């Protein structure tokens, strides 16, 4: 089986069958991003239910990768595999490997808590702690025993999250008093404070109004300079606006149940304007979902 090479961004990375990739030649002018995370998932199960299979997906450093596809195709399941949040669900198991910076994160000796410091998650619904705005951002630093200037990092993180000017005079107020969009940006600031290398986002704008969505999208584009970002979204316009790479997933009937699988993965303009697979074209044009 041919696998993606480490330091290349393929122009036509796609699944021709359910078990193998077909790769064309890579344009050297585009092969300028290294693979920071590489999913090689043969199968993922919830108890006996096969939720996902045959996913071989490289994630490129300092790029925004979106995972798209209809509900139930395994996008969020795969996202949670990237920092082992699925470990918290009883009777789940992964067959395969997920390689982060050369190490299999599912190796028995790998510490999932340490992993999650390097690969953080922003959820669909904002989840600020019932603490002050300041203490929300400082929380992770204190847990890690950080001994530097916490005030400086709190301010810097809030500025990165485009929130500082809105909250600088009320840092002692309860974070739950903020609007939904502000709470989501606070959650991002809280994560940025501990400087993860990869940020996972599971539909981060689905519960937000258009103005807040625009702010979050601007923030995502800004922070990709220092972070690698992977986003699950059902919003095709959002995926086409903000992402560099797009992976399209769909479902296949297997033994009476629908199992998710990767259909096509390429640069975002290719997926939306000239996809290889007809089913990809139908999905991004809204013919099913």
UniProtKB/Swiss-Prot annotation:
SUPFAM superfamilies cross-referenced by the UniProt entry: P-loop containing nucleoside triphosphate hydrolases
Keywords of the record: ATP-binding, Cell inner membrane, Cell membrane, Membrane, Nucleotide-binding, Phosphate transport, Translocase, Transport
Annotated binding of ATP, by residue: 69-76
Source superkingdom: Bacteria
EC number assigned by the record: 7.3.2.1
Membrane topology: Peripheral membrane protein
Subcellular location field: Cell inner membrane
GO process annotations (BP): phosphate ion transmembrane transport
Reactions catalysed according to its record: phosphate(out) + ATP + H2O = ADP + 2 phosphate(in) + H(+)
Any GO molecular function: ATPase-coupled phosphate ion transmembrane transporter activity
Main location, first listed in the record: membrane
Keyword Repeat: no
Pfam family, one: ABC_tran
Keyword match Magnesium: no
Domain ABC transporter: 37-276
GO CC annotation: plasma membrane
Its job: Part of the ABC transporter complex PstSACB involved in phosphate import. Responsible for energy coupling to the transport system.
Quaternary structure and partners: The complex is composed of two ATP-binding proteins (PstB), two transmembrane proteins (PstC and PstA) and a solute-binding protein (PstS).
UniProt record similarity statement: Belongs to the ABC transporter superfamily. Phosphate importer (TC 3.A.1.7) family.
Protein name (record): Phosphate import ATP-binding protein PstB 2
Organism of derivation: Trichormus variabilis (strain ATCC 29413 / PCC 7937)
Lineage, broadest ranks: Bacteria, Bacillati, Cyanobacteriota, Cyanophyceae, Nostocales
């Amino acid at each position: 089986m041919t696998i993606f090479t480490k330091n290349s961004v393929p122009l036509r990375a796609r699944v021709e069958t359910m078990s193998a990739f077909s790769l064309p030649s890579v344009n050297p002018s585009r092969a300028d991003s290294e693979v920071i995370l590489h999913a090689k998932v043969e199968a993922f199960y919830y108890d006996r239910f096969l939720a996902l299979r045959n996913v071989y997906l490289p994630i490129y450093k300092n790029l925004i990768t979106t995972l798209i596809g209809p509900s139930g195709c395994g996008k969020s399941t795969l996202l949670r595999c990237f920092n082992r949040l699925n470990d918290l669900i009883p009777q789940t198991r992964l067959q395969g490997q997920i390689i982060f910076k050369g190490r299999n994160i599912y190796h028995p000796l790998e510490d999932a808590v340490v992993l999650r410091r390097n690969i953080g998650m922003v959820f669909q619904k904002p989840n600020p702690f019932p603490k002050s705005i300041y203490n929300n951002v400082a929380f992770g630093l204190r847990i890690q025993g950080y001994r530097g200037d916490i005030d400086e990092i709190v301010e810097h993180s809030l500025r990165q999250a485009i929130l500082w000017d809105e909250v600088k005079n009320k840092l002692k107020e309860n974070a739950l008093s903020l609007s939904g969009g502000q709470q989501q940006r606070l959650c991002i600031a809280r994560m940025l404070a501990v400087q993860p290398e990869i940020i996972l986002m599971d539909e981060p704008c689905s519960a937000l109004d258009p103005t807040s969505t625009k702010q979050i999208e601007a923030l995502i584009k800004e922070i990709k300079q220092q972070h690698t970002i992977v986003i699950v979204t059902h919003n095709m316009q959002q995926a086409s606006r903000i992402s560099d790479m797009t992976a399209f997933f769909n479902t296949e009937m297997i033994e009476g149940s629908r199992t998710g699988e990767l259909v096509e993965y390429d640069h975002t303009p290719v997926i939306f304007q000239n996809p290889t697979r007809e089913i990809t074209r139908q999905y991004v044009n809204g013919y099913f979902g």
